[in-house]
Every structure is written in structure tokens, then in C-alpha cells.
């Protein structure tokens, strides 16, 4: 039984990028879909599409590579884990990697990128980082 499907999804994206695959499939949850949408908005993934087979949903993710066939994702890492939750206040999530990276934060207003959460003046649980 899988206890952390967000970590599983990040691992699937990381492994697909290392193997230079064009597409990978993730299990669906609203948090994962919001996280993938942030990755697409920030330019780390090309696109995504939710597929439904009966009552089972999956997310098909298209990875993005630069002109040299190198993944645009340098590192993708789970921050808050089931055994150790990490929360940051509105002042702590301002920047990550001097603006070159993105933190995904679960807030009371939904799953947001760190810059959007800072603009709204809210903090929350840091789900993952990507740069």
C-alpha cells in the first residue's frame, strides 16, 4: 500500500526526466493535479491532461527538455513528509534558490507556488521544491 502518492508522483517525474522519456503517467489527486499545473505554469513541464477510465483517474504529463535534450528540471524534491511536516509562514516563503526555483505550498486558499502565496500574504505546508 502506498502512503504518499505525492512523493510517488515526484519520483515518477524525476525518473522519466532522467531516462529522457517524453510522457509519464501519474495517479490522480486534486493536490497532484494542482502541483502539476504549477509545474506547467512555471515552465518545468510541457503540459498535462487528466484521463478518466471508469472511476479511475490518471494524469498524463508531457516532460520538457531544452535544445540539448537536457531536462529543464534540475532537481525535484519532496519537502514535507508524512513523518515530518514542514510549515512556513508568509515571510519565510518569499524566494527559493534566489528566484530560480519554486516551492509548492498547500495553503488555506489551495495549492500555490511560493511567489503567489507571498503575494497573497499566506503561509502553509511546503509540499515540494523544484528548480
UniProtKB/Swiss-Prot annotation:
Alphabetical keyword list: Ribonucleoprotein, Ribosomal protein, RNA-binding, rRNA-binding
Disulphide bridges, residue numbers: none
Gene Ontology terms: biological process: translation
One MF term in the entry's GO annotations: structural constituent of ribosome
Signal sequence, renumbered to the chain: none
Keyword Ribosomal protein: yes
Keyword RNA-binding: yes
GO cellular component entries: ribonucleoprotein complex; ribosome
Pfam families: Ribosomal_S8
Quaternary organization: Part of the 30S ribosomal subunit. Contacts proteins S5 and S12.
NCBIfam families tied to this protein: PRK00136.1 (NF001109)
Family, per entry: Belongs to the universal ribosomal protein uS8 family.
Function: One of the primary rRNA binding proteins, it binds directly to 16S rRNA central domain where it helps coordinate assembly of the platform of the 30S subunit.
Protein name: Small ribosomal subunit protein uS8
Amino acid at each position: 500500500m502506498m502512503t504518499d502518492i505525492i512523493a510517488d508522483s515526484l519520483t515518477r517525474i524525476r525518473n522519466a526526466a532522467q531516462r529522457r522519456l517524453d510522457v509519464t503517467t501519474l495517479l490522480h489527486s486534486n493536490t497532484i493535479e494542482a502541483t502539476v499545473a504549477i509545474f506547467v505554469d512555471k515552465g518545468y513541464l510541457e503540459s498535462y491532461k487528466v484521463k478518466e477510465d471508469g472511476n479511475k483517474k490518471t494524469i498524463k504529463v508531457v516532460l520538457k527538455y531544452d535544445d540539448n535534450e537536457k531536462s529543464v528540471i534540475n532537481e525535484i524534491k519532496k519537502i514535507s513528509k508524512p513523518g515530518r511536516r514542514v510549515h512556513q509562514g508568509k515571510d519565510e516563503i518569499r524566494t527559493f534558490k534566489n528566484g530560480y526555483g519554486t516551492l509548492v505550498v498547500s495553503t488555506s486558499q489551495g495549492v500555490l507556488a511560493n511567489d503567489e502565496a507571498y503575494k497573497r500574504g499566506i503561509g502553509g505546508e511546503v509540499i515540494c521544491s523544484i528548480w
